[in-house]
């Protein structure tokens, strides 16, 4: 819980240099694997897509 609190604080505070700003998943706080188009990490994206919570997204099959 303390880690999540620190993540929330880091969202509010702007860094000294803009290149230090790292996009994080708002659901789990993960800094890596962020999908900018959907605004979440790949893991949360996959879970929501499989549950059908993201409109227009479905599992690929060919």
Curated annotation (Swiss-Prot):
Q: How is the cofactor bound?
A: Binds 1 zinc ion per subunit.
Please name the GO terms that the record assigns under molecular function: rRNA binding; structural constituent of ribosome; zinc ion binding
Q: Where does Zn(2+) bind?
A: 25, 28, 41, 44
What cofactor does this one take?
Answer: Zn(2+)
Q: Which domain of life is it from?
A: Bacteria
Q: Which GO terms describe its biological process?
A: translation
Q: Which InterPro entries match?
A: Ribosomal_uS14, Ribosomal_uS14_bact, Ribosomal_uS14_CS, Ribosomal_uS14_sf
Give yes or no: UniProt keyword Transmembrane.
no
Whether Lipid biosynthesis counts among this entry's keywords is no
UniProt keywords (A-Z) are: Metal-binding, Ribonucleoprotein, Ribosomal protein, RNA-binding, rRNA-binding, Zinc
Q: Which PROSITE patterns match?
A: RIBOSOMAL_S14
Q: Any one cellular component term from GO for this entry?
A: cytoplasm
Gene3D superfamilies under this entry?
30s Ribosomal Protein S14, Chain N
Q: What does this protein do?
A: Binds 16S rRNA, required for the assembly of 30S particles and may also be responsible for determining the conformation of the 16S rRNA at the A site.
- Family in the record: Belongs to the universal ribosomal protein uS14 family. Zinc-binding uS14 subfamily.
Q: Can you state the subunit structure given in the record?
A: Part of the 30S ribosomal subunit. Contacts proteins S3 and S10.
Question: What's this protein's name?
Answer: Small ribosomal subunit protein uS14
Q: Which organism is it from?
A: Sulfurihydrogenibium sp. (strain YO3AOP1)
């Amino acid at each position: 819980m303390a880690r999540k609190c620190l993540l929330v604080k880091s969202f509010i505070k702007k860094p000294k240099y803009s290149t230090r700003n790292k996009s994080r998943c708002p659901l789990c706080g993960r800094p890596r694997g962020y999908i900018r188009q959907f605004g979440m990490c790949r893991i949360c994206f996959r879970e929501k897509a499989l549950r059908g919570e993201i409109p227009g997204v479905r599992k690929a099959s060919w």
